[in-house]
């Protein structure tokens, strides 16, 4: 999931935002993760925009994808080169309208963008955790987010919205905390990682661990495994695009030359140069150990096993919310059949579900790109949710 896709800003930005931090678990009252380990303190980095209304019923939790962060919209400083990773969707007058909704986005635990992860200091040693950091799950991420949401004064979310791994978190929220979620918008996602998705992640992890600078995860005082992480990212980028996208964007065009170089170390083709650029850019902002932990959390994700004893129908029997599910025609990482399967399980439980497969040539990353149809659907879906919430609140008076 290439969270920082270039796009032309449209509409009005939320303007300047501030990254904040909240301790969701202390050292003396740790968070026990699903692997059985106790973790504390646990800090989440988060950002908000918009205002929580008096009824506290307009909060939308936006959930980031694999290597994203809390910076979903706006700018830290007026001169920043680019806004948050979903600025095209979040802001005044945009589908997730910050004039109407209170938007929350946090960096997941295990991350490296301000939340507690393997690069954080272990209070027991004063050194970075490295591989002593406990293995985490999507469920652990959501449990930490729940504490943040409650801290912010929200007892019931208007919606949980996310694509890719963010969609996994949205699904987890909907069945783990059904009384806290009015609606959910899982985009380009799945109820369980397929063998194909696991395979790509494993190859990426092996690339990192094969880098001699990885040093068993203990590289924080030395040279990081930049080459291995870059190769891992290159593998990921292949899965985020599609055959059609690659043909249109690159085809077999050469990079800065008119004929083959006949030098193995040189990137002859534009697609080679693109992948190398994306890999090198990634190592400047992401921690290799976090990549290992978060990809493993995605691989472990299996909503059917964790909440339904192997049955998607049984898992969604716990849910109470309305869903808007969207897949993309060229997404071969989480293809449409996986979304159709989850929608069928939802409907077998009598849940209110809207589903659309959107025609898009750009592959898995299409959920991050401008799409008028998707934008309109999300805007209308949230509008209805807010109206329904107001009616429900009025009946409760």
Swiss-Prot record:
Signal peptide: none annotated. It comes from the Bacteria. GO terms for cellular component: cytoplasm. Its EC number is 2.3.1.31. Pathway: Amino-acid biosynthesis; L-methionine biosynthesis via de novo pathway; O-acetyl-L-homoserine from L-homoserine: step 1/1. Disulfide bonds: none annotated. The keyword Glycoprotein does not apply. InterPro entries: AB_hydrolase_1, AB_hydrolase_fold, HAT_MetX-like. The active site is at residues 164, 331, 364. One of its GO terms (biological process) is homoserine metabolic process. Keywords: Acyltransferase, Amino-acid biosynthesis, Cytoplasm, Methionine biosynthesis, Transferase. Its main location: cytoplasm. Substrate binds at residues 233, 365. It is found in: Cytoplasm. GO terms for molecular function: homoserine O-acetyltransferase activity. Residues 58-368 form the AB hydrolase-1 domain. It catalyses: L-homoserine + acetyl-CoA = O-acetyl-L-homoserine + CoA. The keyword Repressor does not apply. Transfers an acetyl group from acetyl-CoA to L-homoserine, forming acetyl-L-homoserine. Homodimer. Belongs to the AB hydrolase superfamily. MetX family. NCBIfam families: homoserO_Ac_trn, PRK00175.1. This is Homoserine O-acetyltransferase.
